[in-house]
């Protein structure tokens, strides 16, 4: 791939798709709209963190997972995002051990994730792409790779699950498997 490509037209199309997503979100019931927008807007930030799991109290103080179940259903059903739930026992029958209070939220399209992550830099989009192609932009590439894997798994008909193991000795998770 040549490093002098102009990605302005492609990025403009992707930004238009993101605007259409936002317009669609604005059409849903008011009781869900704020939560859906909050999650949608936070997807790039959530994925760029080491701990990618959604922490609901960080969205709104005192909130919890059950208050957002319709939100994730709407985003997933509209194919904007792919949800990934904790599985307490990585064994046969993953859905039996599904814990819906722990969720990761991936974008349904990794190319859109990149534009969504840099949506405040609309005037600099060609510069951003040039820096990416020349390996000069400091971004969390892991979030892109992880999102690609999530997108591929869903495209092949798989539900997304992750696993963590809490160590009582270390007082933290000592094992995490992103996809099982």
Language-model-detected regions and their locations in the chain:
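Conserved helicase/translocase motor-coupling segment
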Residues: 1-77
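A cross-kingdom feature that marks ATP-driven nucleic-acid transaction machinery
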Residues: 70-180
């Amino acid at each position: 791939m040549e490093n002098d490509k102009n990605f302005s037209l492609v990025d403009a199309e992707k930004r238009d798709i993101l605007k259409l997503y936002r317009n669609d979100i604005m059409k849903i019931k008011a009781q869900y709209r704020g939560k859906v927008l909050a999650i949608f807007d936070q997807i790039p930030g959530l994925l760029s963190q080491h701990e990618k799991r959604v922490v609901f109290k960080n969205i709104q103080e005192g909130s919890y997972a059950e208050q957002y179940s319709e939100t994730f259903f709407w985003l997933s059903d509209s194919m904007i995002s792919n949800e990934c739930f904790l599985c307490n026992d990585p064994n046969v029958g993953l859905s039996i051990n599904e814990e819906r209070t722990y969720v990761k939220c991936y974008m349904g399209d990794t190319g859109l994730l990149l534009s969504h992550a840099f949506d405040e830099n609309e005037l600099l989009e060609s510069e951003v792409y040039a820096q990416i192609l020349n390996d000069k932009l400091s971004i969390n590439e892991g979030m892109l790779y992880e999102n690609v894997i999530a997108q591929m798994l869903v495209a092949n008909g798989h539900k997304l699950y992750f696993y963590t193991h809490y160590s009582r000795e270390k007082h933290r998770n000592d094992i995490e498997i992103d996809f099982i």
